Amino acid sequence: MDFTRDDNSSDERENDVDANTNNRHEKKGYHRHTNEQIHRLETYFKECPHPDEFQRRLLGEELNLKPKQIKFWFQNKRTQAKSHNEKADNAALRAENIKIRRENESMEDALNNVVCPPCGGRGPGREDQLRHLQKLRAQNAYLKDEYERVSNYLKQYGGHSMHNVEATPYLHGPSNHASTSKNRPALYGTSSNRLPEPSSIFRGPYTRGNMNTTAPPQPRKPLEMQNFQPLSQLEKIAMLEAAEKAVSEVLSLIQMDDTMWKKSSIDDRLVIDPGLYEKYFTKTNTNGRPESSKDVVVVQMDAGNLIDIFLTAEKWARLFPTIVNEAKTIHVLDSVDHRGKTFSRVIYEQLHILSPLVPPREFMILRTCQQIEDNVWMIADVSCHLPNIEFDLSFPICTKRPSGVLIQALPHGFSKVTWIEHVVVNDNRVRPHKLYRDLLYGGFGYGARRWTVTLERTCERLIFSTSVPALPNNDNPGVVQTIRGRNSVMHLGERMLRNFAWMMKMVNKLDFSPQSETNNSGIRIGVRINNEAGQPPGLIVCAGSSLSLPLPPVQVYDFLKNLEVRHQWDVLCHGNPATEAARFVTGSNPRNTVSFLEPSIRDINTKLMILQDSFKDALGGMVAYAPMDLNTACAAISGDIDPTTIPILPSGFMISRDGRPSEGEAEGGSYTLLTVAFQILVSGPSYSPDTNLEVSATTVNTLISSTVQRIKAMLKCE
């Protein structure tokens, strides 16, 4: 019996051991997910790497897995991804470390083997360099002491200033090719090139009353006359590195749609989140107000042609005539080889828009084009510094952070353009006028939207101007009977718009301040001498005034284009109605036209025609016009002469939304900023140095004032 009981106990223990062993094997068993489950889990992980309990339960029901299995899979996946990223980062850091180490070795070799350029021997040693540096510091301290001693002596004995600043300003003229203008400042003295001082030009009540005759600062030398030193090898390397960083940053900004960009609280446009930007990118300038914007447009132009225009300063200025006032390529960092993948330029550009009240912006930018993939190119801009460069302003008011465009080639000659503008503006130095403050602060001034709207319009104009084999049906050719005549008129209109937009800067201006109105800027008068083809040679007085109207821009634009009422405000009509002699559409919008107008003047001696070019876009519009005698108009209409030789002196109107948010977004807002500008030829090339411009100033002041009052009365905005 005892042996039987022992045997039974032994059997039970063996059974228990076998059961425990089986349970242990069952606990250690692995469950492999199916390929469908893994694919679904990985897809979900890309969208949400940290699902909550509810999401895990739903996903488990979908895949027939327990929530705990889902939880453990996501934990393992996150650990695996983190490990993979760390390995990739370590590999990149090791490669960068090796690269830097090799660069240091090459620099050390170069320093050890440096030679003296004059004699070809070994360069100075470390001790010689320190001795020379101490000598320079001692000389610098001595010169500072001498400067202080002489300055104190002059102050004590009433001496004059140590530097002489020329008071007479240079006077500019517009250029047919933005960066090659020869109509540059000339000092006018006792010779035929001397212009009287402002105090002798404007006498009488203007200097004592409501006219500001403070002489502006002396402008810079023309770019073609400035001495640009060749870039050293180190400067080229530094610029190429900056260009690479700019391309990378702009590409990241475009790809980070949801995280980096947010909607503006003012007008729902996309702006960069400053907090995230400081987190992801290195700040280059924090002393100012950042402006950022992004816009996308599809234009009818081949991507290759767009890239060529962006990299050629003269073509760039012609493509954006109402924004780019001047542009010039300063340095080419590599050869223009479109089969290559990357090429860079150093470009000077001056931007100006809408009104003399809007301060221009000057940049020295590094522009880089890089092919990202097939049919996709990135063009990035970033501010760069060159020594001994003269600007119109004695101090820059803007710095361009990495900005640019992504160009994607589309079928049938179209291109998709994604535009990013990111600048830092120092408003403390040049504060914009209150009329345009909302426009500039809201981003509608120099923002991406203005660039894309202008790009779309000018691309359409190029198509309508150059790719038309015969007179289109939507044109009203009238007196123009040939396609050559049409092309001549279109070219004249384009040049007139460009010259009118250039004139708006009015660097050398004198102000008539407003007497009482709060929505008027007063009248600004500028004087310049023109010596180049395309405009009448001689002394020209230009004047402009800006005002706010409680009407949408489209209504103001249609009013200025209305021929039935034009004779009531246009002095060129002499009170007689005008008819349309010819009209050509310049874009998909039938309101954008270039036309010849003919006032019904009976006297054949005073009979003339008016060339008018006008456009309207999402941000405003422009109406520019110039009078022509019948012989000149007939020559332009025939197309038998070069249109660039026909002199044009345009006047007109700049129309803009005011930048304030409104419900009438489709019509450009409920308020309009209108700038009226006229030009008068005072005398021909042989003007007298004693010319008194008081009569001309009075005439143009009266002309501007009366035109503004008539327009306001007709629009019932008094």
From Swiss-Prot:
SUPFAM superfamilies registered for this protein in UniProt: Bet v1-like, Homeodomain-like
Q: Which GO terms describe its molecular function?
A: DNA-binding transcription factor activity; lipid binding; sequence-specific DNA binding
- Stretches of Polar residues bias are at 176-194
Tell me the InterPro entries matching this sequence. Answer: GLABRA2/ANL2/PDF2/ATML1-like, HD, Homeodomain-like_sf, START-like_dom_sf, START_lipid-bd_dom
Q: Which Pfam families match?
A: Homeodomain, START
Which coarse location class applies to the principal site listed for this UniProt protein? nucleus
Superkingdom per UniProt? Eukaryota
Q: Where is this region: Disordered?
A: 1-35, 169-209
Residue range(s) of DNA binding per entry: 26-85
Q: Which UniProt keywords apply?
A: Coiled coil, DNA-binding, Homeobox, Nucleus, Transcription, Transcription regulation
Q: Which residues form the START domain?
A: 232-464
| Coiled-coil ranges (or none) | 78-152
- Localisation per UniProt entry: Nucleus
Q: Which PANTHER family match?
A: HOMEOBOX-LEUCINE ZIPPER PROTEIN HDG10-RELATED (PTHR45654:SF9), HOMEOBOX-LEUCINE ZIPPER PROTEIN MERISTEM L1 (PTHR45654)
Question: Which family does the record claim for this protein?
Answer: Belongs to the HD-ZIP homeobox family. Class IV subfamily.
Q: Write down what this protein is called.
A: Homeobox-leucine zipper protein HDG9
